[in-house]
């Protein structure tokens, strides 16, 4: 899979102190849709000026994680989307690893990485395996497989 088939969606709510590290870790040739759950026009201008690959959408109010992600995913024009938390940092090989998996398993719906444990030990699982749930900090969507909404908007989640 080529990078032009991937977009990143990030939901924020007053995350100015965290978002720069996240955005700085994303390759600049990947489009990013940042959905800010507020009406902070200054934040939007600053982000879009600093990161030309980022489109910042202001919701006007805090609609929650599910609604905001659905707004962002609805704007994606690529086949795949990576939903990412604003405090997540993409390591150098993360995108490439996702792309390798899409080449191997082109019939997938969702893919998620194994994250660091609370004690900061890194879990290295180079093989793929099925799980019952995914951690929400980074979810890789095959948008071709989804029909309808992505997140259940009855759940506000954390934001």
Q: What are these regions, as identified by a protein language model?
A:
Residues 12-28:
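Short, well-formed alpha-helical segments that are part of the catalytic scaffolds
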Residues 59-76:
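Glycine-rich, basic loop-to-helix element that forms the pyrophosphate-binding segment
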Residues 138-148:
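Conserved nucleotide-sugar donor-binding
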């Amino acid at each position: 899979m080529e990078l032009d088939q991937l977009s990143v969606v990030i939901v924020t709510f007053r995350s100015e102190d965290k978002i720069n590290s996240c955005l700085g870790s994303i390759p600049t040739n990947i489009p990013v849709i940042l959905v800010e759950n507020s009406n902070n026009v200054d934040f939007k201008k600053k982000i879009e000026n600093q990161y030309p690959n980022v489109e910042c959408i202001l919701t006007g109010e805090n609609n929650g994680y599910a609604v905001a992600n659905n707004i962002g995913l609805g704007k994606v024009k690529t086949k795949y989307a990576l939903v990412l938390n604003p405090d997540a940092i993409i390591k150098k090989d993360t995108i490439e690893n996702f792309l390798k998996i899409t080449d191997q398993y082109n019939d997938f719906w969702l893919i998620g990485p194994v994250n660091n444990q609370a004690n900061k030990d890194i879990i290295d699982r180079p093989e793929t395996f099925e799980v019952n749930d995914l951690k929400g900090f980074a979810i890789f969507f095959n948008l071709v497989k989804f029909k309808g909404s992505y997140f259940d908007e009855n759940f506000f989640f954390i934001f």
